[in-house]
Amino acid sequence: MIQPQTHLNVADNSGARELMCIRIIGASNRRYAHIGDIIVAVIKEAVPNMPLERSELVRAVIVRTRKELKRDNGMIIRYDDNAAVVIDQEGNPKGTRIFGAIPRELRPLNFTKIVSLAPEVL
């Protein structure tokens, strides 16, 4: 469950290291975002000499949350951290590599590029 002011790790090599959620895209009064939701975030920590800089506004899709994810078959998945992947306006990742496991729930949400770059899909 990600809400405004939540800090997230970045799971790609776009140049950002840490994000802070400031808005959840898709509904005017939604309080929480879950895996697969798009957020507007500000970069809190960035790698030097990269295209993305600190205090820049970006869009990101949430790929891991510490809150449990319940599947239809009864399986429950929980990750160790809250993480997101920085995306552009079309939904493609800005980085060329994805770090860590990615849930398969992203595939039907048209984030197939992120799923194909991921080293592990749970």
UniProtKB/Swiss-Prot annotation:
Protein location: Plastid
Annotated keywords: Plastid, Ribonucleoprotein, Ribosomal protein, RNA-binding, rRNA-binding
GO cellular component: cytosolic large ribosomal subunit; plastid
Gene Ontology BP annotations: translation
Pfam families: Ribosomal_L14
GO molecular function: large ribosomal subunit rRNA binding; structural constituent of ribosome
NCBIfam families reported for this sequence: rplN_bact
Oligomeric form and interacting partners: Part of the 50S ribosomal subunit.
UniProt record similarity statement: Belongs to the universal ribosomal protein uL14 family.
UniProt-recorded name of the protein: Large ribosomal subunit protein uL14c
Taxonomic path: Eukaryota, Viridiplantae, Streptophyta, Embryophyta, Tracheophyta
